[in-house]
Amino acid sequence: MSERHAALTSLPPILPRLIRRFAVVIVLLWLGFTAFVNLAVPQLEVVGKAHSVSMSPSDAASIQAIKRVGQVFGEFDSDNAVTIVLEGDQPLGGDAHRFYSDLMRKLSADTRHVAHIQDFWGDPLTAAGSQSADDRAAYVVVYLVGNNETEAYDSVHAVRHMVDTTPPPHGVKAYVTGPAALNADQAEAGDKSIAKVTAITSMVIAAMLLVIYRSVITAVLVLIMVGIDLGAIRGFIALLADHNIFSLSTFATNLLVLMAIAASTDYAIFMLGRYHESRYAGEDRETAFYTMFHGTAHVILGSGLTIAGAMYCLSFARLPYFETLGAPIAIGMLVAVLAALTLGPAVLTVGSFFKLFDPKRRMNTRRWRRVGTAIVRWPGPVLAATCLVASIGLLALPSYRTTYDLRKFMPASMPSNVGDAAAGRHFSRARLNPEVLLIETDHDMRNPVDMLVLDKVAKNIYHSPGIEQVKAITRPLGTTIKHTSIPFIISMQGVNSSEQMEFMKDRIDDILVQVAAMNTSIETMHRMYALMGEVIDNTVDMDHLTHDMSDITATLRDHLADFEDFFRPIRSYFYWEKHCFDVPLCWSIRSIFDMFDSVDQLSEKLEYLVKDMDILITLLPQMRAQMPPMISAMTTMRDMMLIWHGTLGAFYKQQARNNKDPGAMGRVFDAAQIDDSFYLPQSAFENPDFKRGLKMFLSPDGKAARFVIALEGDPATPEGISRVEPIKREAREAIKGTPLQGAAIYLGGTAATFKDIREGARYDLLIAGVAAISLILIIMMIITRSVVAAVVIVGTVVLSMGASFGLSVLVWQDILGIELYWMVLAMSVILLLAVGSDYNLLLISRLKEEIGAGLNTGIIRAMAGTGGVVTAAGMVFAVTMSLFVFSDLRIIGQIGTTIGLGLLFDTLVVRSFMTPSIAALLGRWFWWPLRVRPRPASQMLRPFAPRRLVRALLLPSGQHPSATGAHE
């Protein structure tokens, strides 16, 4: 140990002296603080459930799209939904439908938890779309109330309770699955795993501490310190979360617990390692305490600030998966650092008073001295060998594949996975997790014109690669509505014509009846023509007789006039007699005179008759002359009717042959389900069934239409995500140049959501990674006071991070055959950035202390002094994080093992070989801009001044320092 170091320890700083003086008080304060925060608020898991935040990125385009669908259709305002699956041993019948109806009534009545039910199976029009091909399963989507995880979980539990308390018929089972149910089960599995993993971790750490220290008391005391740290961190984070300082998530609570255990154990090992080293060097307990504090406090502070700062950089992330990790873990690490710098030294002081922390075995530094000697002797080959080892992991990175399917990372016994497995026996994965496309315009689309455009949109999307099914108003069951193709409409016109052919045949036969009637009429006309000749002859005779009668009547009239003129005076008597009517003779004679007046009238009428007879004799021959043309015309008409009959008969026979099966084309197009010639007439909008379909696929005002799209394969895969942009592109191309051009297009669903998550994760990883690297670099420069050393630390951390993630890919993906979950990359990268610099920092800090002995000697001494401690701490940290593999959430296990592999690589390769070999290769440039001696100064010069100045003072006068060949 150098004199400078001795001088520093001879006058210890005030902080370690205060800690040593008030050690018992500090221990009691920490115990009281831990008890208070754990009694004042519920446990961390309980607070986490009550203050959990939604994992869905609320500002993502896909989430906004789903919410927009719910708004314009007036159905829901959240993105949480579950799927209720009915499965029967036999095809679902009336009992299953009655059970389903009862369940729907219960769900509809619970408006506190249920926002909307997408009841397709309850409507005969769309039932086939929600029923399996074997008729043994059906499903219904239920949208829940709640935009944060706490409300959503309550809604999931309420729906499950209603399903469980509604007795199904024999042979029928009901399951609750879907995204919200899966997230609820994930949180439950994570919370249940914390206690199990913590217990396993405690036992493993206890065993490792026994191996390291060979002392039960030391191991127990370290575990007690770690337990107090863990209790304080858990309680303090729960207290802050309970007061809404920040929100929590399953990942935050799980990672916080193990990070607290691992970091607290690491810091305890750092302190005990340096304390034991000082005791082996012959220092008393108090001096060893100050040496320990001086040698590790800045390392612990730098390590803790690095972890806390790097984790807090996650607060800049947009995804709740990462954002919820930032503040809780950062604050937890600050508490761990505070405990390590106060509680740890206090416990060490109290324990050392009772000689509890004295080393039980001799430290063996020979092996690490040999490693250090080999490194300074062959730094180039050692560095090349470490790079070769790192290349194993780096070469595995290009084969990295990820998945977004949460089901694979949860126990198969979870209710959501059980329900998903039941659904998977009857439905494709994409059918239960469809994409929803919304097209919103500024006018009512309930008309034939816009129906053509909407069908074009559906057709374009359906014919793009990777699409299994598209449901829309023009294809409610995934295929175009039957009888809506133009060929079918034309074919139906042929069917109508065929139905009219029999009527036409009857009318053609009626022509023959008309011909027969015409023949009868012609014959009648011939007879009438002959009879008309006879009538004319008789009429001429009658005319002659009429003339004779008129002459006779005129003569009679004249004679009667003569008679009347003679008897006129007598006649007057008969008209003047008032009582002539009563005298028969008088009245009779008067009547004779009246008869004479009638002869005048008769003569006048006969004259008229003679004139009429003369006219008739003139007209009758003319009338008879018209009959031959009429007979000719009727004969022509008869002949033309016969010709028309023959023509129509031939046409009928030809049509009958051509229209043998007029509906064949329509049936063929219906069977082929070709959607190239869709047309929906205006009359369809009055159809009651179609009106029900409009309510499902068009908004109440008709200005928005939704499409339900099922992808081929699993949408929660990179292949499924790659279909999102083509769907949007096809929709935009379909409405280009149509009345819907300029309409707003929204796309949500499983693949769209994970696409937004993938893009958000890239952004978050970039932002958090750059921020964390910058922060770590600044902290390292402050602590080491060397730009190059800080850059080397950060550079090796980044290299270690890439190699360790590649090793994780190699282990999980290539050896175990399990793809890594999408968030493993981002979380493990940030965590490795945070914890990866600890051991390099401890090594370089020790190297800086020993540099007075020369660069190479300092490397050897630093390796000997820190090798065992850093290896033990790194192994404990790595094993602690790897114990996440016992969690029921395989995601946590993948994150933990990735970090564990990274810490092992960092401890055994980077810190042990790569960093010291780089320091040996760079020499004094490793410490730039600090000025260091490549070789040690003489013992008498070292404490005082630079060699040239001291020699100028001590050497005899006239002897210049340069004459001795001495140099700096």
Swiss-Prot record:
GO terms for cellular component: plasma membrane. It comes from the Bacteria. The chain crosses the membrane at residues 22-42, 204-224, 245-265, 297-317, 328-348, 378-398, 763-783, 787-807, 815-835, 866-886, 890-910. Gene3D superfamilies: Multidrug efflux transporter AcrB transmembrane domain (1.20.1640.10). It holds the Pfam family MMPL. Its main location: membrane. Keywords: Cell membrane, Membrane, Transmembrane, Transmembrane helix, Transport. It is found in: Cell membrane. It is a multi-pass membrane protein. InterPro entries: MMPL_dom, MmpL_fam, Mycobact_MmpL. Belongs to the resistance-nodulation-cell division (RND) (TC 2.A.6) family. MmpL subfamily. This is Probable transport protein MmpL2. It comes from Mycobacterium tuberculosis (strain CDC 1551 / Oshkosh). The gene is mmpL2.
